[in-house]
Amino acid sequence: MNQDITFLSDGGDTVRDLQLYLRPPAEHLLDWFHITMRVTVMKQMANGIPRTDLVDLEAEIDRVEWYLWHGNVFRALQVTDDLYFDLEGLVVACPAVTKLWKAVDEFRGYIANNSAFIPNYGDRYLYGEVISTAFVESTINQVISKRMVKKQQMRWTKRGAHLLLQVRTQVLNDEWRDTF
């Protein structure tokens, strides 16, 4: 098996350990989808906070996202640290700031723990390389929700779900036509 493998994960310890156990020399990446989910939540929190003269929260969060997109984890963590300390001074003034402050702190730890798995997503995207599992998750959600509509009264069997995943994997690997 001399096939290159790229693992995309949400950054959880268990998943990462499993990847390293299964195939240590493979490429291990943090899924961009999971980064943007967290960034989007922080932006929504920032929208609910009254503007201050001290810092433009949304602009700072955008900077963090930009640095991560370009694989500059060091600068992303610096900006995140600055944002964390700026918010720390405002925590007493507004409960919404406290929520964002905690989210930024959690995000800071998440990025620091997964820094070794953050590539230059912009370059990977430019060269047509996979950066996210969002398209797979979206497809699976569509198929499952279609199947679970009450009018159709269909339920998944273990065999049916397994067969669906085999077909989907073949389609994604451009192997589907070879089956026939």
Show the residue positions of the predicted features.
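Catalytic center-proximal scaffold of phosphoryl-transfer enzymes
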Residues: 1-180
